[in-house]
Regions:
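Active-site-adjacent "subsite" loops/lids of carbohydrate-active enzymes
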Residues: 20-22, 26-51, 121-173, 177
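Catalytic domains of carbohydrate-active enzymes, especially glycoside hydrolases
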Residues: 48-77, 177-180
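Aromatic-lined carbohydrate-binding/catalytic grooves of carbohydrate-active enzymes
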Residues: 63-100
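Polysaccharide-binding and catalytic clefts of secreted carbohydrate-active enzymes
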Residues: 65-66, 73, 116, 134, ...
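Substrate-binding cleft of secreted/luminal carbohydrate-active enzymes
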Residues: 261-262, 266-284, 301-372
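Pro/Thr/Ser/Gly-rich low-complexity, intrinsically disordered linker/stalk tracts
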Residues: 356-401, 452-466
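Beta-strand-rich modules
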Residues: 410, 434-454
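C-terminal tail/sorting-segment detector
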Residues: 466-469, 484, 528-552
Length: 552
């Protein structure tokens, strides 16, 4: 990441981070593009494939990614034991071959994502079915589906009345078998090479849009009948239609490929859209605003062309991408990287930027139009928190709720609307032990239901807390400058580092620029921070925490 990008980001991170924001990655299994390269052919190779996936997910977690879009149906083939379609070759290297030994790649991925507090959505490639001689395509032809072949591969005919219930059955199978958080429909449209409407036998633009919408509706109805909390989404072409001042240049969702995605939002057939906005300049910004303006109070997550950072794919600079991320966040829009490899390989420093851009944890947006089913947690003992002499704390609570979000702050009561106070998301236990905890840290817990709706917060009981008897030890400041503690003079200071509560670096200050033991903090927004000092031997010392509160 360039020095200028780091400076711009540092300035940006002093702002309050969004508590609700989808931060997603598409993990492509097609041809193992993002999927582990070790084939699962033995117990040992299964372990290697699992470890590769764990390493990928660990990188997501370190960057505070909260949503994984995992390609579960590839090209009429799957990455799980399906009763409907054959195995994809990305798992074992051979199409139709099961890995054996009880290994279920999708089941494993669901478990590992949830361990990390991340949602996992099953990405379904709908209309493409691969090469005409592939096992998946041949299987569909034997079942009597109409298949059309182009230079780019073979495709289901969206006008075939059997397509909608068939694709719905696949999505239904996944939702029944797995605790996925969403179904993400890809290529839910007419293929690029499909002939223009003939206006014969009902082949009109309106009828084509109706054909695609019928497939979407069938999948929606099947999924919601099984688990109504599973999010329905799709990835439409990045430009919905021509705008009054900006042309889509003859490639848009509504008119070119028969995707009326904004209408699906209006009808409630989609909870989210991930438009594939792999464009720059006037081909991006007016169109992301158009998606937001026509979201009908549902969620938009902009699909980023991260792969263009690789010179073999395009000529984008990191600045091209980061500007889109800044603007989308200001519009209240989440972001999704296409693809995983280009993010985790840190092309042009994009992974480093992602980690800093996501300075705090965040929750995916809650589902609209539902009533909360979560029960507020309550303390097991007199207080939520038990503090021990070894500086560890144990949080204990009870409730009948699938998830809990854990918050912490140096102020009481803990502000659970501030993302900077989020410590854990989608936690599934009812006991949490933490070691080496600052004695001035307060805690709170909120339950969360399957729809993402939170309960009121359970705060710790101050009457029974040792905190109420402890003197404040926060570093003194007036909102503009912070007085460095005496200990700072003893450290051979080289630089001071200001961090968020979660440990993300927000500011690095050269010690030579500090005058009269006063550290400038005027550009920080109100909130809680910690301060470290590094000496010339690069050894670090924690100087303490401080609160910026300037008043109204």
């Amino acid at each position: 990441m360039t020095t200028q990008a780091q400076t711009n980001l540092s300035d940006y991170l002093t702002k309050r981070m969004p508590k609700r924001e989808t931060r997603a990655v598409w993990l492509t299994t097609l041809a193992s593009l993002d999927w582990p390269k070790n084939y699962a052919r033995s117990e040992e190779s299964i372990k290697l494939q699992k470890q590769e996936l764990i390493d990928i997910l660990d990188k997501y977690q370190k960057a505070n990614i909260n949503t994984v879009l995992l390609q579960a149906r590839v090209r009429a083939a799957t990455i799980y034991p399906s009763d409907i379609e054959p195995w994809d070759q990305c798992i074992t290297g051979v199409e139709g071959r099961a890995p054996g030994y009880g290994y279920d790649p999708l089941g494993f991925a669901v478990e590992e994502c949830h361990k990390r507090g991340m949602e996992i959505h099953a990405w379904i490639a709908t209309i493409p079915v691969g090469a005409k001689n592939s096992l998946g395509c041949r299987t569909l032809m034997k079942k009597g589906f109409r298949i059309r072949n182009f230079s780019t591969g073979s495709y289901l005919d969206p006008a075939d009345p059997g397509v909608a219930p068939y694709l719905a059955s696949i999505c239904g199978e996944i939702v029944r078998k797995y605790d996925v958080d969403g179904i993400n429909l890809d290529y839910i449209r007419y293929p690029d090479g499909w002939p223009r409407p003939s206006y014969r036998d009902g082949d009109t633009p309106d009828q084509r849009r109706s054909n695609i919408t019928a497939i979407v509706r069938a999948i929606h109805d099947e999924v919601k009948a099984i688990k109504p909390w599973v999010k329905m989404s799709c990835s439409p072409i990045g430009k919905h239609a021509d705008l009054s001042r900006y042309s889509s240049k003859n490639f848009n969702a509504h008119d070119r490929v028969s995707q009326e995605a904004q209408e699906w939002m209006r009808l409630g057939l989609m909870d989210q859209l991930y438009p594939m906005q792999y464009f720059r300049g006037d081909n991006y910004y007016p169109f992301v605003a158009d998606w937001v303006e026509n979201a009908y109070k549902r969620e938009i997550v902009t699909g980023l062309g991260t792969y263009f950072l690789d010179p073999r794919e395009g000529n984008w600079t990191l600045g091209d991408l980061t500007r889109q991320m800044y603007v989308s966040r200001d519009l209240g829009v989440g972001h999704a990287h296409f693809r995983s490899y280009f993010l985790t390989a840190n092309k042009q420093g994009v992974y480093d930027f992602e980690k800093q851009f996501n300075a705090t944890l965040s929750l995916p947006h809650k589902m609209q139009g539902v009533v909360s089913t979560a029960a507020m947690p309550y303390a097991v003992n007199s207080s939520l928190v038990e503090r021990r002499a070894d500086k560890s704390v144990i949080l204990r609570w009870k409730a009948v709720t699938p998830y809990y979000n854990i918050y912490a702050s140096y102020t009481y009561p803990v502000d659970t609307e501030d993302a900077r106070n989020l410590l854990f998301t989608r936690y599934t236990g009812q006991t949490l032990q933490l070691k080496n905890v600052n004695p001035n840290l307060y805690f709170a817990v909120r339950g969360m239901d399957r729809y993402g709706l939170e309960t009121p917060a359970l705060q710790e009981n101050m009457k029974s807390s040792t905190l109420s008897k402890s003197p404040a030890t926060l570093l003194a400041n007036d909102g503009n400058t912070l007085t460095l503690p005496t200990a700072a003079k003893l450290t051979d200071a080289d630089r001071y580092v200001i961090l968020s509560l979660q440990g993300v670096i927000l500011r690095i200050v050269n010690a030579k620029s500090v005058r009269n033991n006063q550290l400038y903090i005027g550009s920080l927004s109100d909130g809680m921070y910690s301060l470290k000092v590094y000496n010339h031997k690069k050894k670090s010392f924690t100087l303490g925490a401080f609160m910026v509160k300037r008043g109204s």
